[in-house]
Amino acid sequence: MDGHVQHDGFGRDINYLRIAVTDKCNFRCIYCMPADGVAPRAHDELLSAEEIARFVRLVAGEGIRRVRLTGGEPLVSRRIIPLIRDIRAIPQIEDISLTTNGALLPKLAPQLKDAGLNRVNISLDTLDPTLFGKITRLGRLEQTMAGIDAALAWGFEPVKVNCVVVRRLNQDVAALARLTLDRPIHLRFIEYMPIGDERTSSHCAVDPHAPALNPALWDASDTVPSDELRARINAGAAAVGLGELEPLDINDAPAGAGPARYWHFPGAAGTVGFISAMSNHFCANCTRLRLTADGNVRPCLFSDAEYSVRDALRRGDDMQVLSIWRDAVAHKPQEHAIIEGTQRFMSQIGG
């Protein structure tokens, strides 16, 4: 099957697929998942590794060139290594990446590298061990830091570290940015995006009387614009005698830079990026679709519009799978409508 470029209704090249391989996780982050996890699904409700790989093979013929594996936590899935191998064997796929909390990277990094994984994104919202424990419920800061070190040691390139900034929650952005001084990582600050539907966030709360730890109480005022973040980081740098962030030449941006805009401290080993999903949304350049663990294609993270390919895959009806895919691409919205919200937990979407 020869590959070609597929455009959506607004002329965007659809070349990037994010796949939630599981909705399970070894953490219980307050903005992502209820404290007791998501309701377990019957095995036959979820796509098998073989079905996922076959779907990727089909849409690679429609122009997909980059694949990101997400969850939940993709590394808790026993099928993650063979799945990466199968996707790596698809000639049109140029890049395979994975988003993780990092806790299992020290154990799995060698196998992931051998299977053909190119790069990783690691989630890290704070350097305060106590706050880290409250945000993740089950995680420890040293686990994620060890995961970052393992990713660097095993030569994944680039290693990106993602921090979602919520005004009333995590305040140590300056310290996080300084991790790039001696580590060749790309620390990206992501503006908090209020999804609008409190059904999910109210089930994630740690303490209904502690607003900072209750996502149901977060609102648009908790979004910290990238310009404000950069000013806070520069103020923190000045306080310890460092120079201000300088803009990075676009040609020096890390692979898969996507919507992030990158800066760096003078002489630093890494970079600092800003993803301005709210203050300067990047929908006009969005080239991605998502596949959920139960076999639904989502054209947009912030819409509940889904197109199920599971039954067609199981019937072996490749033409029907492609017809559903093309329909999903054709209905990708021009821009997100965050106010509409979503009926799924973030761990089920693979956001």
Model-derived regions: residue spans:
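Conserved beta-strand segments that form the floor/walls of ligand-binding pockets within enzyme
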Residues: 16, 20, 68, 99, ...
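N-terminal [4Fe-4S]-dependent radical SAM core
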Residues: 1-18, 28-30, 61, 260-271, ...
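Radical SAM enzyme [4Fe-4S]-AdoMet core and its adjacent flexible, acidic
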Residues: 130-133, 138-145, 149, 153-271
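Radical SAM/AdoMet-radical enzyme domain recognition
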Residues: 46-69, 77-190
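Flexible mid-to-C-terminal extensions adjoining Fe-S/redox cofactors in radical SAM and related proteins
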Residues: 274, 278-351
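Canonical Radical SAM [4Fe-4S] cluster-binding loop centered on the CxxxCxxC motif
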Residues: 10-49
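Conserved, mostly hydrophobic/aromatic
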Residues: 21, 25, 29, 69, ...
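Conserved G/P- and acidic residue-centered "switch" motifs that form tight phosphate/ATP-binding loops
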Residues: 73
